[in-house]
A protein has these predicted regions:
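Long, well-structured alpha-helical subdomains associated
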Residues: 94, 134-158
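Non-transmembrane interaction and regulatory regions of membrane-associated proteins
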Residues: 117, 121, 125, 129, ...
């Protein structure tokens, strides 16, 4: 009698362990697939942003060091007015294939060009708009957390 109870317990434990490993394997496979999809979308976004720089005539360069900045846009200022006609964007080499820093700097370009706004908030707003114009709905869902984090669109907790 005890042997049957013990055997039943062992079988139940083995089934639970096998189920756990199957679920873990399947989740890892899904996560890996999602990472591949996200990487593909980020590469496409980066390529689109670089193409936009070329179309707008913005010189884009990569550097090993930029002080404490991940990227920056260089533009002219005269009598309190900002000019981005000959703007240059500089990005750290380690962010060369990552879209968010480039999008932020292009956001500065757009905010200055449209509203004479050189603020970080203005750049983030424009960068978010720009990325959402480039990405389709599914791609936006895939990068939703990244877009919110990089462009400071987080809800304020009270």
């Amino acid at each position: 009698m005890w042997i049957y109870i013990l055997l039943a317990i062992v079988i139940i434990v083995l089934i639970c362990v096998a189920t756990y490993f199957y679920i873990d394997w399947r989740m890892n496979k899904e996560i890996e697939q999602e990472h591949k999809e996200r990487d593909t979308v980020e590469k496409r976004l980066t390529t689109s942003l670089k193409t936009l720089c070329v179309q707008l005539g913005i010189d884009l360069s990569y550097h090993k060091e930029l002080g404490d900045a991940a990227g920056r846009i260089l533009y002219h200022s005269m009598n309190g007015r900002l000019f981005v006609d000959d703007a240059r964007i500089e990005i750290l080499e380690k962010y060369k294939d990552e879209p968010y820093t480039l999008a932020h700097e292009l956001g500065h370009y757009m905010a200055i060009k449209q509203r004479q706004d050189s603020s970080e908030e203005g750049a983030d707003t424009e960068a978010d708009k720009l990325c959402r114009l480039i990405l389709n709905d599914n791609e936006q869902k895939l990068l939703a957390i990244s877009l919110r984090c990089y462009f400071h669109q987080m809800e304020v907790v009270k």
